[in-house]
Amino acid sequence: MTNTLLLIAQLNVMLKKLKTLISVSALVLVCAFASTLESCKSCNSGKDLGIEETSDTTLRAINAKITAEPNNFAHYLERARYYSGLKKYAEANADIVRAKAIDSTKADIYFTAGKIHFDQQRVVEAYEDYKKCLEKDPQHKEGLLEKAAMDIALNNYELALQQINTVLRQDERVAYAYYLKGRLYRQVKDTTLALSSYQTAIEVDPSYYDAYVEAGLVCASYGNPLAKEYYNSAIEIHPNFIEPYYNKAIFLQETGVKNPSNYQEALVCYDKILGIDANFSAAYFNKGFVYLVYLKDYQKGIESFNLALEKNPNYYQAAYNRALCYEGKGDKTNAEADLNLALKLKPDYTEAALELGRLRGDD
């Protein structure tokens, strides 16, 4: 009996110690849970989510999405793209880091990072981002095309074509894919396939401005009059863009020998450009060049070169060509003055030095 009572007493002591231990452990768990909750609150705080007070309504709308779904990586990518458009690259890159922290396996994260790095002209990093995008998803259409565009620039033509065709096997109605094919073939000087690719891009997307412009350049490279029509289509899409007027004017003045009316039409294009930007000195210069070289109207050439130099006082080519206009009029004094001006602006201007020597030798 005594031994039994002693055993019961020892068990009671052990039970009390066990209860105390359980209580302490429970307290530790409660404290740890509370600490974790506080930590989570801190992790999801506005500051850690990249949310600042702003009057920008678009940014506020994106921030609201992030607040509602802080673990949705797509919201951070949306904000990164928005920041990149504002050239706030530090903020954009921070959102890429947040997106990767949520799920680093998503191809869209690396595609967006590539676009942002490319916008910053960090092309090596952009190329690596696109490679990672395709590692995560080899069928990622946008990633394939952006990497293909860079591969064309790097002369990786076979790889670029493979990537473009991978996209077209998924969807044959991607205008940008045909446009890139056009660029590739144009770069390797296959004008037939280049033009065909641009035409297909236009068929898929009749408002594809860049495809019209580059199709025009391909046609212009071998004097095809279709160049003018492609440039006209580009002008219809963007009537306030200088580029298509300028390209059209160059084509017209270079083909004026076969069709002399092209010279006047080229002058009209330059006037259109000056209506868009009155300070575009190259348009004044090119007008002067048409008057000097093609129309032999030296006075109008002088007037145009005057305006080119007024807009750009360092335009040494304008001074040189104005000198030639004065020579055409028989005014050697002003011609010599302009040749000296051209050499003052560009001391190693060989053509001006030779012309000045010839002019003085005639005296």
Predicted features by range, described:
Residues 1-52:
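Bacterial Sec-dependent N-terminal signal peptides
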Residues 84, 111, 118, 145, ...:
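Position-specific recognition of the canonical hydrophobic site in helix A of tetratricopeptide repeat
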Residues 42-46, 254, 320, 324-363:
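Terminal, low-structured helical/coil segments at or just beyond the last alpha-helical repeat
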Residues 37-97, 101, 361-363:
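N-terminal leader/linker segments that initiate helical-solenoid repeat arrays
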Residues 52-61, 87-98, 120-132, 154-166, ...:
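Structural signature of tandem alpha-helical TPR/SEL1-like repeats
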Residues 73-74, 107-108, 141-142, 175-176, ...:
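Helix-start (N-cap) detector for alpha-helical repeat units in TPR-like alpha-solenoids
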